[in-house]
Amino acid sequence: MSKRVTVLMGGASAERDVSLRSGAAAAKALEQAGFEVALVDCDRNPAELVRAITETRPDVVFNALHGRFGEDGCVQGVLNLLGVPYTHSGLLASAAAMDKAFARALFASAGIPVAEGRVITRTDRNGPDPLPRPFVVKPLNEGSSVGVFIVRDNQPSPLPDWPFDADEVLVESFIPGRELTAAVMGDRALGVLEITSDHGFYDYEAKYAPGGSRHLMPAPIPEADYAEACRLAVAAHKALGCRGVSRADLRYDDTVPGQPPRLVMLEVNTQPGMTATSLVPEMAAYQGITFPELVRWMVEEARCD
């Protein structure tokens, strides 16, 4: 008898549309892998989540939610209480990764290089620039590059107008160079991919619009640097306590003549996209792992923690 898998998707975060696409694509792959699949469009109401889980009676929950509630430990906590195994990382790892300031502190303590940065509060918004330009301003707990600003010379800073929902944001030095991402599956890296985009950086549109970005797999960097990027991705996965699949985003700064390139960890995504243009399925395919095989492995690795 095949396992029943409930796919949680949608949600009420800024990444709702992406989650709907991830959930639909994952559901199709799960059916191809032989599972009995139910789809649930989940909001931020824990009582509604409990009702949906009770009605669908899954053996495993496939969490295709992105952003707040689905990615920050809330859904994971509810499923832990219900005793229903679920894919991706557990409560603590999810909460840690979603808080960018806390995650970068864990990375630094594990010897993983991070950009210079600090947390700025709403009350600091009218002060001088928090860091030398160029710098990056990002919400502490959003994904898919939602609400990210790059502040360059002769550009207005968003801080005085404060177009953010939260009272705190993270400000980091902008790292020039190239955009890399590395997928981790269990305790091994699937490889490193370079992303190029005409948008200047890998923003929401570049991530999810067809043709918004170009992917180079494997990343065309020296073998030693490629291996180091893989090592850092696994180290970050372990520093956060992740399980299942994660994706580490890094910068590769090879812009200084006469200086060796440097790798800088930006963040780890514990709920990487599962859309047709998503990176983890692409990197898995490069290793000969089909999308149905990938989601089957994720279901087999599901647990409560």
Swiss-Prot record:
Residues noted as binding ATP in the record, renumbered to the chain: 131-181
Reaction equation(s) it catalyzes: 2 D-alanine + ATP = D-alanyl-D-alanine + ADP + phosphate + H(+)
BP GO annotations: cell wall organization; peptidoglycan biosynthetic process; regulation of cell shape
Binding annotation for Mg(2+) 2: E267, N269
Positions with a binding annotation for Mg(2+) 1: D249, E267
A Gene Ontology term for the protein's cellular component: cytoplasm
Domain ATP-grasp, chain residue ranges per copy: 104-300
Pathway named in the protein's UniProt entry: Cell wall biogenesis; peptidoglycan biosynthesis
Keywords for the protein's UniProt record, in alphabetical order: ATP-binding, Cell shape, Cell wall biogenesis/degradation, Cytoplasm, Ligase, Magnesium, Manganese, Metal-binding, Nucleotide-binding, Peptidoglycan synthesis
Cofactor requirement: Mg(2+); Mn(2+)
Keyword Lipid biosynthesis set for record: no
Subcellular localization: Cytoplasm
InterPro entries, per database record: ATP-grasp, ATP_grasp_subdomain_1, D-Ala_lig_Van_CS, D_ala_D_ala, Dala_Dala_lig_C, Dala_Dala_lig_N, PreATP-grasp_dom_sf
Cofactor remark: Binds 2 magnesium or manganese ions per subunit.
Pfam annotation, one family: Dala_Dala_lig_N
Major location (coarse): cytoplasm
EC number(s) stated in the UniProt entry for this protein: 6.3.2.4
Entry GO MF terms: ATP binding; D-alanine-D-alanine ligase activity; metal ion binding
Role noted for this protein: Cell wall formation.
Family of this protein: Belongs to the D-alanine--D-alanine ligase family.
Name used for this protein in its record: D-alanine--D-alanine ligase
